[in-house]
From Swiss-Prot:
Lipid sites, type S-geranylgeranyl cysteine: 205, 207
Modification(s) after translation: Deubiquitination at Lys-191 and Lys-194 by USP32.
Annotated catalysed reactions: GTP + H2O = GDP + phosphate + H(+)
Oligomeric form and interacting partners: Interacts with NTRK1/TRKA. Interacts with RILP. Interacts with PSMA7. Interacts with RNF115. Interacts with and FYCO1. Interacts with the PIK3C3/VPS34-PIK3R4 complex. The GTP-bound form interacts with OSBPL1A. The GTP-bound form interacts with RAC1. Interacts with CLN3. Interacts with CHM, the substrate-binding subunit of the Rab geranylgeranyltransferase complex. Interacts with C9orf72. Does not interact with HPS4 and the BLOC-3 complex (heterodimer of HPS1 and HPS4). Interacts with CLN5. Interacts with PLEKHM1 (via N- and C-terminus). Interacts with PRPH; the interaction is direct.
The gene coding this protein: Rab7a
UniProt protein name: Ras-related protein Rab-7a
Coiled-coil ranges per UniProt: none
Tissue distribution of the protein: Expressed in osteoclasts and in neurons.
Motif (Switch 2): 67-82
Listed cofactors: Mg(2+)
C-alpha cells in the first residue's frame, strides 16, 4: 500500500481590522484568547495538522492585515489559496458591508482557476457581545446570494463554533486542492488540425 503524499492546505482569513481574525486563528490553533488588541502588520500564519475524512492534512492559516494600505500585499499571500475565510463583526455593520470588496479583492489577487466555485466561508464573529447589529438572516441572505457560502456565527473569546467552522473550512479546502490536482494530472487534450490527424492516422496504419 502506497502512502499518500502530505497535503498542505493554504487558508486565507480576510476582513476589516479589528473583526477578530487573529483571535479566531489563535483560538483554533492554540486554544488561546487575548483581550489585548494588536493589529497584524502585513501577514502572519499558523499551521495545524487535522484529520479531514480520515486524511491527515496540514492547514496553513494566513492572517492578513485589515488595513487598506496593506491590501496591495495581496498577490503574494493570496496565490495558491485553497479556501478564503471572510470575517465580520456582528456588532459593527460596516465590517459586514465590506465583505463584497474583500471577496472581490481576493478573486482579483488570487486569480483562482474557477472563481465561480472557489470555496469561501463566512464567519460572523463576536456573538458573545450584547450590542449585536447585523442580523443572522441578513448575513445568511448575503451568503446565499454568493453561491450559498457556508456561514457560521462565532466567538473567538468564548470558543463558540470556532472548531466547527474550521472543520468546514478544512473540508472545503481539501476538496479544492483535490480538484486542482486532478486538473493538473489531466490537462486539456491537444487538438490536432485536419492535416495532423490524417498524418497520424496514416502512420498508425501498418496493414
Amino acid at each position: 500500500m502506497t502512502s499518500r503524499k502530505k497535503v498542505l492546505l493554504k487558508v486565507i482569513i480576510l476582513g476589516d481590522s479589528g473583526v477578530g481574525k487573529t483571535s479566531l486563528m489563535n483560538q483554533y490553533v492554540n486554544k488561546k484568547f487575548s483581550n489585548q488588541y494588536k493589529a497584524t502588520i502585513g501577514a502572519d500564519f499558523l499551521t495545524k495538522e487535522v484529520m479531514v475524512d480520515d486524511r491527515l492534512v496540514t492547514m496553513q492559516i494566513w492572517d492578513t492585515a485589515g488595513q487598506e494600505r496593506f491590501q496591495s500585499l495581496g498577490v503574494a499571500f493570496y496565490r495558491g489559496a485553497d479556501c478564503c475565510v471572510l470575517v465580520f463583526d456582528v456588532t459593527a455593520p460596516n465590517t459586514f458591508k465590506t465583505l463584497d470588496s474583500w471577496r472581490d479583492e481576493f478573486l482579483i489577487q488570487a486569480s483562482p482557476r474557477d472563481p465561480e466555485n472557489f470555496p469561501f466561508v463566512v464567519l460572523g464573529n463576536k456573538i458573545d457581545l450584547e450590542n449585536r447589529q447585523v442580523a443572522t438572516k441578513r448575513a445568511q441572505a448575503w451568503c446565499y446570494s454568493k453561491n450559498n457560502i457556508p456561514y457560521f456565527e462565532t466567538s473567538a473569546k468564548e470558543a463558540i463554533n470556532v472548531e466547527q467552522a474550521f472543520q468546514t473550512i478544512a473540508r472545503n479546502a481539501l476538496k479544492q486542492e483535490t480538484e486542482v490536482e486532478l486538473y493538473n494530472e489531466f490537462p486539456e487534450p491537444i487538438k490536432l488540425d485536419k492535416n495532423e490527424r490524417a498524418k497520424a492516422s496514416a502512420e498508425s496504419c501498418s496493414c
